[in-house]
């Protein structure tokens, strides 16, 4: 099995940027979460849920970490990561909650860049497992 080289990031187009989300990015993150809900044909979060999401992203310490993906300076994708714990292993685990790219920005390596940023977050930490659920895309 090939282990990703986290010290030499793969090449991404210059138009692609992934960075930790800031409080100023909250409206863009919420718009992307609503975009994911629309894509999944689910109701979007209500105002109370959006308020809790912002609180949890930017509390100290944050309950979830958000990474914002941009293409040509436009907010086009995001991922959420949070730490959990395995009672059986007695070690921390990381959970990848969402990894979403707006349809208009797919095929530009932004999803790959978001995933790589998640792997860089893990790099060097003693994390026994990484959990995520992969669902079959609704448009297949």
Predicted regions and their residues:
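Conserved beta-hairpin
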Residues: 65-79, 102
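A short helix-loop-beta-strand connector motif used in the catalytic cores of GNAT acetyltransferases and
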Residues: 55-68, 95
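A conserved beta-strand-loop-helix scaffold within acyl/acetyltransferase catalytic domains
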Residues: 71, 81-88
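A short beta-loop-alpha structural element at the N-terminal edge
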Residues: 17-29, 42
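Conserved acyl-CoA
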Residues: 102, 113-129
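Conserved glycine-rich acetyl-CoA-binding loop
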Residues: 89, 102-113, 140
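Conserved GNAT-fold acetyl-CoA-binding loop/helix
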Residues: 33-55
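Conserved beta-strand-loop-alpha-helix junction that forms the acyl-donor binding cleft
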Residues: 129-140
């Amino acid at each position: 099995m090939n282990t990703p080289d986290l010290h030499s990031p793969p090449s991404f187009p210059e138009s692609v940027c992934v960075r930790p989300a800031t409080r100023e990015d909250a409206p863009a993150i919420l718009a992307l979460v609503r975009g994911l809900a629309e894509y999944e044909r689910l109701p979007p979060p209500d105002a109370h849920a959006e308020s809790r999401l912002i609180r949890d992203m930017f509390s100290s310490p944050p309950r979830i970490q958000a990474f914002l993906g941009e293409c040509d300076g436009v907010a086009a994708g995001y991922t959420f990561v949070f730490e959990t714990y395995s009672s059986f292993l007695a070690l921390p685990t990381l959970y990848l909650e969402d990894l979403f790219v707006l349809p208009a920005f797919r095929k530009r390596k932004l999803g790959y860049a978001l995933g790589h940023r998640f792997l860089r977050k893990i790099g060097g930490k003693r994390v026994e497992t990484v959990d995520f659920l992969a669902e079959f895309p609704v448009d297949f």
